[in-house]
From Swiss-Prot:
Part of the 50S ribosomal subunit; part of the 5S rRNA/L5/L18/L25 subcomplex. Contacts the 5S and 23S rRNAs. Disulfide bonds: none annotated. This is Large ribosomal subunit protein uL18. GO terms for biological process: translation. One of its GO terms (cellular component) is cytosolic large ribosomal subunit. Residues 1-23 are annotated as: Disordered. Keywords: Ribonucleoprotein, Ribosomal protein, RNA-binding, rRNA-binding. It comes from Mycoplasmopsis synoviae (strain 53). GO terms for molecular function: 5S rRNA binding; structural constituent of ribosome. InterPro entries: Ribosomal_uL18_bac-type, Ribosomal_uL18_bac/euk. PANTHER family: 39S RIBOSOMAL PROTEIN L18, MITOCHONDRIAL (PTHR12899), LARGE RIBOSOMAL SUBUNIT PROTEIN UL18M (PTHR12899:SF3). Residues 1-17 have a biased composition (Basic residues). SUPFAM superfamilies: Translational machinery components (SSF53137). Pfam families: Ribosomal_L18p.
Length: 117
């Protein structure tokens, strides 16, 4: 029990540390990802104004669920939404997740659309 509490505490600290580093680069909007076992979510957040500029989720599309194919499709959708907002660069917030699997597929798909991190 104590081991899982320590692990959860370390993950939370890691996320907060990454978020504080990203908020220093406040000139760019933050592209934040969240993954559950069943779905994948992403938001484009303007930390200065504290508003969400765009969002996508596999829950809304309902095609694939939370697998790598869904993450790639959502990445293409988010890349198009970012370009529609006339933004070229964003700060990518992995939210403490490893850059692997669904997170990597999402990021690569956003980059395919021409958005720079």
């Amino acid at each position: 029990m104590n081991l899982s509490r320590n692990k959860a505490r370390k993950v939370k600290q890691k996320r907060l540390r990454a978020k504080s580093e990203l908020s220093r680069a406040a000139s760019k909007p933050r592209l934040s990802v969240f993954k559950s076992h069943a779905n994948f979510y992403a938001q484009l957040i303007d930390d200065q104004k504290r508003v969400t500029l765009a969002s996508v989720s596999s829950l809304k599309s309902g095609k694939y669920g939370g697998n790598v194919a869904a993450a790639k499709e959502l990445g293409l959708l988010m890349g198009q939404k970012i370009l529609d907002l006339k933004l070229e660069t964003v700060a990518f917030d992995r939210n403490g997740y490893l850059y692997h699997g669904r997170v990597k597929a999402f990021a690569d798909a956003v980059r395919e659309k021409g958005v720079k991190f």
